[in-house]
Amino acid sequence: MDVDRPGPGEELNDGAVTVPRQAATVIVLRGGAQTLEVLLVQRNPAQRFMGGAWVFPGGAVDAHEGEGDGAHRAAAVRELAEEAAIEGVDPTQLVRFSQWITPPEVKIRFDTHFFLAPLPEGAEPRVDGDECVDLGWFTPAGALAAHAAGELLLVFPTIKHFEQLSGFATADELLAFATGREVVAVTPRVVMSGEQARILLPGEPGYDTAPATS
């Protein structure tokens, strides 16, 4: 299987499409006008969902956080505090970057809104050792190289985001690009070739002709 095109890693459904749960993720940046580094946290390998994977801090929207953009921003700030001990982020200053919806073929689905946020001055990220067991700062190219070498487990959306981030030299450049930009939701599809699952993105050959799900 291609290193940059891993299978979904989760159980496929039995044909009935699950409604995705709302979620938020934060791509924390540092480097300012000098460079670009991104924070990743490692999920506890004992966890059933994406155990051992290195991910951007994030998680599902809680019911009390409401609906819509405000709920996604509230969840993003809460997850930053819970998973990386990063406090003091103004939810209104988060910059929308992307929206990814889990393929309809996968049983556990999320509609995840990705935000950019510079690391607050004085913040010292750390993990709780329970849900997340490690963290690190990575350049986009460094993260992709470590994944290709088998040193860093990345899931498909994280890989694709790092591929996009690799086109920017500094955190400031990335933030300037993303501010005010229209975000279009991306919904990959999973197609089977024998026993092997492959993920397709919109516009790729086979995406529009993938078997319909109900």
For each predicted feature, which ranges?
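N-terminal leader/linker segments that precede catalytic domains of diphosphate-processing enzymes
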Residues: 1-132, 136-214
